[in-house]
């Protein structure tokens, strides 16, 4: 078996976010790390929309990310710490739209190791030095400088190691232009390590240590170290030099402390708590992330607590000595991994879980009536301030970036009967959890819909002048009339436009600088800007059947075969070319390209004929309408469209969009593509040679059951093609790649580009008798999603086969059930009433009632933390088509759903489905202790509209996995595998196997075989012998694997994903037998007594691959109608991908050679060796990396040609191969 790994949706979770001026202009950008890829975003300061400039795989794990600027520089650089054992400095090149490596210095081994630096970064605020630290012992400092050409240089590393020291965080201290200084949170564990009693460990204190880099001596010294009272989790650097007092803010549990060297004494302020909080009162409060905003005149800090509350922190100074810390509640947003305050007035919040947000900072919170807390306010030790959370007041949400992370599990199914399967994904944590239904397609925003008096057959938009920014008219053609609408604040009908309204229109367009042209069956109207009209009438009884128009040319067909060509002269008149051309067959469609800049005409006309050919005719005045080339088609052409794609005029993208070989030429022009829509629903894309007119390199895609109609529109400043069949598709070029993506919208019939003040790049389209104005904002998106909120973290789900409804198990740790929450609120309210004196009793009663009635949405304000060992669970039935919860079954406090299965019991003989739910009671995670578990059985109503509770079976272990098996229930109870049958009062235990080593986490069954996954010992192959009623292990794996997901590929083959980001496929060799009777040696009888270490037969590992993210679900499924099966996976970070099988050894050899060349020619950006990355835990075997192969599309033309030459191919052939393998299985 040979597999090819394809990423369908890149990771959406964010691990690091930094902002800066990476492109060198005045614009602010945000650089995100998504674990193993980097993504550059640019928020539009006018609209607030976030645009993705580029996304690049680094084939490594990003551990740390910082932005810095050299003193006096105009752009920011990026320094990346990864698992490569190298420090890498990157620069964004806007002209190539790529991140380029400026420096790469090796300092240690590869991999995420505790003593290899790269986990922590600290930058001197003036950009003169960087310190890079490991979790333990090692720290290195590098000095940044410029050479004579003003290029960035980096020094040799200076060591600042200290043995037996753990580092928690480090920052660069702002000391102006004094020697660079770095502050570190450290713990020295030497004494604790030597003391066997553990007393020293209890006494160990965290220290704040300052390291100074002496630029004169080129040496790092430990300048100062001080023990801390509270355990701190991170540091915030305070502006220094001329801008502020310098020093650091130490964020620790319940306290915020300011420290600095010299005469400064410590300033300490408690972290405010929410008033009347339901949280466990013993639980401390910490800050989890921060953002600093500084201008020449002021600075402030935004710090966020783990509940999501943001506080604005300011420091009061007296002669550069800090005298007071002031805190003010700012707003509440979802808890974040990183926050960035941009100079354009935006706050970017990269959420820990769920979607990421961009907010406009509307107010700084200085003038509101929110109380301000201060370190100078007198408080007893251990007391704190209280505040009341509220809805957003200072922030305004302007954009949202969808994120699926964390994906808990997923399933491919076609519950909506749409032919194309949907992906049902359980995402999120706690009250921000969602079920998301993902469909392949672009999200469409409907700007306007209006009914028309009849069913139109075509629509166009035109500008009055060529240099106008927006369109002036929408022209709608009916069977016997033409309607002209003017575009302004509203869309209204006009009658004085010069268009003929009493006839249908075949085509209309802007002509020249300021004229319009209308082609109708009886002639051509040329409407000048002063409303003069020149008409050309069709001769005799002939009528115009087809036409093609651009800015300077008009081509028409008379009565089917005769071609007439018009061209505009310098005076603006439309002149007919003297000779007409007769085609050998009836003309079905025609297309002209746009006139290139600086040219007088488009040089070629494409004509589709009824004889199943498309012909290219020259429009050169010297040999006008002479054939240049011809291409035979499998069926008649329905429509043609000539577009220039693969280059950029884009202002939004801010970078060069160029693709494969064909696009690259010295003048940075794109390639001319002829798109051919066939009557059988197939779209062909062919490259048109701009000199000879030859057609080459044809690509094919099936779009739908209807004939394909094509329309040229503008997307992000570049040309794109809208293709309409039974679904509407958009073919466009984005981030160095061609995309052909369906629109998630109903069927359209005709369309044109649309541009107005409200919608600069839209589409105007017709569907039956309605006119629609649409906008596409999320170009590059793979999936269009619909999200349905859930209450607790979803754990697993099953789909009811008869109704398609979903039964979802939701369970949260550290949470209250609704009943417990109400009881706790009532208890706190009663305490408020009883604590009040006689004169305050009425006020206390009002406050208690207000507290009980107050409902803060938990998806924003977080749910209360109940304490360790407290669980809340429920079973939800959801109609995934409409997102409607049919019913929910809440469980009592401290019952946690661990597993769930839907099955039919053969003994019940009612043909009904039953739901088995595995529950743990009073589970404590660390150490793992519980009061046992139970299996609840529910009978499912045939319409899945209710669950009937049958009975509960108590067991002494936690039921970690359940599975239906031959009309009975297989249960993994701790490390015991049991078969239960249905009983009247409880489940009846029929059979047991005690030889799984640790804990069963997954069970699959097929035929007489059971495939059982252990938490850390991979998969066991078990045979059920019905005659002896025995479960016998007959084979197992040779390697330990910490299993997260499995799926069966066939009777002998299973795919396994583990906690370290690996996928492996295990297959039983032909020699393995699962029948004990065939073994004459009698050794198999020993397994049952557990005398051998594992089974005597072993599975073979046939595929291994390191994905780099924890795979949470695996499924063998098809993603496109008529496509082949692939192994679909979803990861914790939000990635959706597929392992697709090679159908021939020849294809495998081709891609293996391409991968090998790409490793050499385009090594990973952050210095990790690609082969060692994909072999991080087990050597990569029989799996090729499609992500690396597809980078071929975006490397330089010279490298493309070199690789193609070495492989005895052309660059176009390689690009076609890459496109074909993707479209055969996925999208």
UniProtKB/Swiss-Prot annotation:
UniProt function note: Involved in pre-mRNA splicing as a component of the splicing factor SF3B complex, a constituent of the spliceosome. SF3B complex is required for 'A' complex assembly formed by the stable binding of U2 snRNP to the branchpoint sequence (BPS) in pre-mRNA. Sequence independent binding of SF3A/SF3B complex upstream of the branch site is essential, it may anchor U2 snRNP to the pre-mRNA. May also be involved in the assembly of the 'E' complex. Also belongs to the minor U12-dependent spliceosome, which is involved in the splicing of rare class of nuclear pre-mRNA intron.
UniProt-listed PANTHER family: DNA REPAIR/RNA PROCESSING CPSF FAMILY (PTHR10644)
Family listed: Belongs to the RSE1 family.
Key words of the record: mRNA processing, mRNA splicing, Nucleus, Spliceosome
Presence of keyword Transferase: no
Quaternary structure (record): Identified in the spliceosome A complex; remains associated with the spliceosome throughout the splicing process. Component of the spliceosome B complex. Identified in the spliceosome C complex. Identified in the spliceosome E complex. Component of the U11/U12 snRNPs that are part of the U12-type spliceosome. Component of splicing factor SF3B complex. Identified in the SAGA transcription regulatory histone acetylation (HAT) complex; the interaction is RNA-independent.
Protein name according to UniProt: Splicing factor 3B subunit 3
Gene Ontology process terms (BP): mRNA splicing, via spliceosome
Gene Ontology CC terms: catalytic step 2 spliceosome; nucleus; precatalytic spliceosome; SAGA complex; small nuclear ribonucleoprotein complex; U2 snRNP
Pfam families: Beta-prop_RSE1_1st, Beta-prop_RSE1_2nd, CPSF_A
Primary subcellular site in the record, as a coarse category: nucleus
Places the protein is found: Nucleus
Recorded GO MF terms: U2 snRNA binding
Coiled-coil region(s): none
């Amino acid at each position: 078996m040979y597999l090819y790994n394809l990423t369908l949706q890149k990771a959406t979770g964010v691990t690091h976010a930094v902002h800066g001026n990476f492109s060198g202009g005045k614009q602010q950008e945000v650089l995100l790390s998504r674990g193993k890829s980097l993504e550059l975003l640019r928020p539009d300061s006018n609209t607030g929309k976030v645009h993705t400039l580029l996304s690049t795989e680094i084939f490594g794990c990003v551990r740390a990310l910082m932005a810095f600027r050299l003193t006096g520089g105009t752009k920011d650089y990026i320094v990346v710490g990864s698992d490569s054992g190298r420090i890498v400095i990157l620069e964004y090149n806007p002209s190539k739209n790529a991140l380029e490596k400026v420096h790469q210095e090796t300092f240690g081994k590869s991999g995420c190791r505790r003593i290899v630096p790269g986990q922590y970064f600290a930058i001197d605020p003036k950009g003169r030095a960087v310190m890079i630290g490991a979790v333990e012992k090692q720290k290195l400092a590098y000095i940044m400088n410029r050479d004579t050409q003003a290029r960035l240089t980096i020094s040799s590393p200076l060591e600042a190691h200290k043995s037996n020291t753990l580092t928690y965080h480090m920052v660069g201290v702002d000391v102006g232009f004094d020697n660079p200084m770095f502050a570190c949170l450290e713990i020295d564990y030497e004494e604790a390590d030597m003391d066997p009693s553990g007393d020293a460990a209890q006494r160990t204190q965290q220290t704040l240590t300052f390291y100074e880099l002496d630029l004169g001596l080129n040496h790092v010294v430990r300048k100062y170290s001080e023990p801390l009272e509270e355990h701190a989790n991170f540091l915030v650097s305070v502006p220094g030099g001329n801008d502020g007092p310098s020093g650091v803010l130490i964020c620790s549990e319940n306290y915020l402390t300011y420290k600095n060297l010299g005469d400064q004494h410590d300033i300490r302020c408690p972290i405010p708590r929410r008033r009347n909080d339901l949280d466990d009162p013993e639980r401390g409060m910490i800050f989890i992330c921060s953002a600093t905003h500084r201008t020449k005149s002021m600075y402030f800090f935004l710090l966020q607590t783990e509940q999501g509350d943001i506080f604005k922190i300011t420091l009061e100074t007296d002669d550069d000595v800090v005298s007071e810390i002031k805190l003010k509640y700012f707003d509440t947003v979802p808890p974040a991994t990183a926050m960035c305050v941009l100079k354009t007035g935006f706050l970017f919040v990269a959420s820990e879980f769920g979607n990421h947000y961009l907010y406009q900072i509307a107010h700084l919170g200085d003038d509101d009536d929110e109380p301000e807390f201060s370190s100078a306010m007198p408080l007893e030790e251990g007391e704190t301030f209280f505040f009341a959370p509220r809805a957003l007041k200072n922030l305004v949400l302007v954009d949202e970036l969808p994120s699926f992370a964390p994906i808990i599990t997923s399933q491919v199914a076609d519950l909506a009967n749409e032919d194309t399967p949907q992906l049902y994904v359980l995402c999120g944590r706690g009250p921000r959890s969602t079920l998301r239904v993902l469909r392949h397609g672009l999200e469409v925003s409907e700007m306007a819909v209006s009914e028309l008096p009849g069913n139109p057959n075509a629509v166009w938009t035109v500008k009055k002048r060529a240099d106008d920014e927006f369109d002036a008219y929408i022209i709608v053609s009916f069977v016997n009339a033409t309607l002209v609408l003017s575009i302004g604040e509203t869309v209204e009908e006009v009658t004085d436009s010069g268009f003929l309204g009493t006839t249908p229109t075949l085509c209309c367009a802007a002509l020249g600088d300021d004229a319009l042209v209308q082609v109708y069956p009886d002639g051509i109207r040329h409407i000048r800007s002063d409303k003069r009209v020149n008409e050309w009438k069709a001769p005799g009884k002939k009528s115009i059947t087809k036409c093609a128009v651009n800015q300077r040319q008009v081509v028409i067909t008379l009565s089917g075969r005769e071609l007439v060509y018009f061209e505009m002269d310098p005076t603006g008149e439309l002149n007919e070319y003297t000779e007409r051309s007769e085609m050998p067959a009836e003309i079905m469609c025609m297309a002209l390209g746009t006139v290139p800049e600086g040219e007088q005409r488009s040089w070629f006309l494409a004509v589709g004929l009824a004889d199943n050919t498309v012909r290219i005719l020259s429009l050169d005045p010297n040999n006008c309408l002479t054939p240049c080339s011809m291409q035979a088609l499998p069926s008649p052409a329905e429509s043609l469209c000539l577009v220039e794609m693969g280059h950029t005029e884009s202002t939004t993208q801010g970078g060069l969009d160029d693709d494969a070989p064909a696009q690259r030429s010295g003048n940075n022009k794109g390639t001319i593509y002829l798109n051919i829509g066939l009557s059988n629903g197939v779209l062909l894309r062919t490259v048109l040679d701009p000199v000879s007119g030859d057609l080459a390199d044809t690509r094919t895609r099936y779009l739908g059951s209807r004939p394909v109609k094509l329309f040229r529109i503008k997307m992000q400043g570049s040309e794109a093609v809208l293709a309409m069949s039974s679904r509407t598709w958009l073919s466009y070029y984005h981030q160095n790649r061609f995309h052909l993506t369906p629109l998630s919208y109903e069927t359209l019939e005709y369309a044109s580009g649309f541009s107005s003040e409200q919608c600069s790049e839209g589409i105007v389209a017709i569907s039956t008798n309605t006119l629609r104005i649409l906008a596409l904002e999320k170009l590059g998106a793979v999936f269009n999603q619909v999200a349905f909120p859930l209450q607790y973290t979803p754990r697993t789900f099953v789909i009811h086969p008869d109704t398609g409804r979903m039964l979802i198990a939701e369970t949260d740790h550290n949470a209250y059930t609704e009943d417990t929450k109400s009881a706790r609120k009532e208890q706190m309210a009663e305490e408020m009433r009883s604590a009040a004196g006689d004169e305050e009793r009425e006020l206390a009663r009002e406050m208690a009632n207000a507290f009980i009635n107050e409902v803060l949405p938990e998806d924003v304000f977080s749910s209360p933390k109940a304490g360790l060992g407290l669980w809340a669970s429920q079973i939800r039935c959801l109609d995934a088509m409409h997102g409607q919860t049919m019913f929910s079954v809440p469980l009592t406090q401290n019952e946690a759903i661990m597993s769930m299965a839907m099955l039919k019991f053969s003994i019940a003989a009612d043909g009904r489905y039953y739901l088995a739910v595995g529950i743990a009671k009073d589970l404590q995670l660390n150490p793992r202790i519980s009061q046992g578990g139970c299996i609840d059985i529910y009978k499912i109503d045939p319409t899945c509209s209710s669950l009937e509770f049958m009975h509960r079976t108590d067991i002494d272990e936690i039921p970690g996995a359940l599975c239906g098996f031959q009309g009975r229930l297989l249960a993994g109870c701790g490390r015991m595998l049991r078969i239960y049958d249905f009983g009247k009062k409880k489940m009846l235990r029929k059979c047991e196997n005690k030889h799984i080593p640790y804990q069963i986490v997954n069970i699959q069954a097929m035929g007489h075989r059971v495939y059982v996954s252990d938490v850390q010992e991979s998969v066991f192959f078990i045979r059920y012998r019905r005659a002896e009623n025995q479960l016998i292990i007959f084979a197992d794996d040779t390697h330990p694997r910490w299993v997260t997901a499995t799926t069966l590929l066939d009777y002998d083959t299973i795919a396994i994903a583990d906690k370290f980001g690996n996928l492996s496929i295990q297959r039983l060799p032909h020699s393995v037998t699962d029948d004990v009777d065939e073994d004459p040696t009698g050794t198999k009888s020993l397994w049952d007594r557990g005398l051998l270490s594992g089974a005597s037969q072993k599975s073979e590992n046939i595929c291994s691959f390191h994905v780099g993210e924890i795979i949470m679900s695996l499924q063998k499924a098809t993603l496109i109608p008529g496509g082949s099966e692939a192994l679909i996976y979803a990861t914790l970070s939000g990635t959706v991908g597929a392992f697709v099988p090679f159908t021939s050894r020849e294809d495998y050899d081709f891609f293996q050679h391409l991968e090998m060349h790409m490793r050499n020619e385009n090594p990973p950006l952050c210095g990790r060796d690609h082969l060692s990355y994909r072999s991080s835990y087990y050597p990569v075997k029989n799996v090729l990396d499609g992500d690396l192969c597809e980078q071929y599309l975006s490397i330089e033309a010279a490298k493309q040609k070199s690789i193609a030459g070495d492989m005895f191919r052309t660059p176009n052939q390689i690009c076609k191969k890459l496109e074909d393998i993707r479209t055969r299985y996925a999208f």
